[in-house]
Amino acid sequence: MNSLREWEEAFEQAVDVKKSYDLAKRMEEPKTNPVLGYRTAGSKAEWETGELLLKEMQEMGLQNVQKDKIKVDSWDFHHAVLRYRDKEGKEYEFQLGAYQTDFHTEGFQEFSMVYLGRGTAENYENIDVKGKLVLIDINQREEWWINFPVYQAHLKGAAALIAVQDQGYGEIHDTSLNAQDIAGPKEAAAFSISQADAAILKEDMGNMEKTGNYTGDFKEIQVLFDAQSTVVRDRESYNITGMIPGE
């Protein structure tokens, strides 16, 4: 081949784009959350996808295809659903995202929810959050990572923290959900909610501006919450590798 373009054309002719696309779509089928997806480390969905790729690698002719066992802190997020009836009697059901923490309600349970601005120590002054859901705003790009307000809520006795992205990540649309890594004890439960859904909840709480400054009497709302998020340490997973024949 005498030119880069000739090499590019030969490469394009050899690559089966449709097969790659179809495989990627098949990889979307195993999921831990039937509504949102998720295929996380150590989960049944990850194992099923790994077996799919193992078979594909063998069938396409890769050599020395093997599974190397590893231990991971696994996370299996099945669902997090929040129901709320507003002051006008309208009922809502919100799908929440989650972070890698452990929380099980075993069906819908009633919780009090409070909105605490940025979730700083100052925001908690004179407020009892024991056993409650704490809603906060967060900008993970320019302020702090999710584990800081989550651990603060955990130390204060909150049942779980629910974060809504306020600038930073998760800004592609007001209905988007954020999912990123977290560092902390698995019992410090954390979930994410979209800006659009959070706005409905905040409208009825009305006790704080987004800055966290009080604007009136403190107010809680009652919600129903059903969540299943499971973290298990030292679960088996696999790295799957194969070698392309040739030199």
Where are these regions (language model features)?
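Extracytoplasmic/secreted envelope proteins and their assembly/folding machinery
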Residues: 8, 17-24, 47-54, 146-150, ...
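Structural recognition of the beta-strand scaffold that forms the well-ordered cores
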Residues: 23-28, 66-67, 113-115, 132-137, ...
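Solvent-exposed loop/turn segments at secondary-structure junctions
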Residues: 34, 71-74, 120-121, 139-143, ...
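A conserved hydrophobic secondary-structure block that centers on an alpha-helix together
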Residues: 119-170
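Noncatalytic luminal/extracellular "stalk/propeptide" segments of secretory-pathway proteins
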Residues: 13-18, 22-25, 29-133, 140
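BRCT (BRCA1 C-terminal) domain core and associated BRCT-interaction motifs
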Residues: 74-82, 162-181
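Soluble metallo-hydrolase cores and metallopeptidase-like ectodomains found primarily
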Residues: 94-126, 180-247
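Short alpha-helical segments and helix-capping/turn motifs at coil-helix boundaries
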Residues: 50, 78, 121-122, 142-151, ...
